């Protein structure tokens, strides 16, 4: 039994010695990658567009004393993305039906009327019209 213990101890030391030896080439690879990592950082930087700041601004206009959790903000962001996706699909479908290559404000307005229900559609159309006139006048 004592010889097996002696054999186990060197066996344990050998993998321990190999592990740092393996780490050294990895470190060298990392050093070689660091020179090109500036390029990779530029490639991997994706601008994630969210509506979180705009949702927060609207919340503060409506209820200045109320906050919102990050989970609720994520849900609201997903909701806005979903609504915009539905509006884009519907306006694209309308443009195809009318054999037009361009989606104009008219297609967007009709899509809003089709996608959003009742009173919400009326308010959205009036706010959208107001935003378009403000944009074209400036």
Swiss-Prot record:
It is found in: Nucleus; Chromosome. There is a cross-link at residue 134 (Glycyl lysine isopeptide (Lys-Gly) (interchain with G-Cter in ubiquitin)). One of its GO terms (cellular component) is nucleosome. SMART domains: H2B (SM00427). Its main location: nucleus. The modification N6-acetyllysine is found at residues 8, 29-30. GO terms for molecular function: DNA binding; protein heterodimerization activity; structural constituent of chromatin. SUPFAM superfamilies: Histone-fold. Coiled coil: none annotated. InterPro entries: Histone-fold, Histone_H2A/H2B/H3, Histone_H2B, HISTONE_H2B_site. Keywords: Acetylation, Chromosome, DNA-binding, Isopeptide bond, Nucleosome core, Nucleus, Ubl conjugation. Residues 1-46 are annotated as: Disordered. CDD domains: HFD_H2B (cd22910). The nucleosome is a histone octamer containing two molecules each of H2A, H2B, H3 and H4 assembled in one H3-H4 heterotetramer and two H2A-H2B heterodimers. The octamer wraps approximately 147 bp of DNA. Belongs to the histone H2B family. This is Probable histone H2B.3.
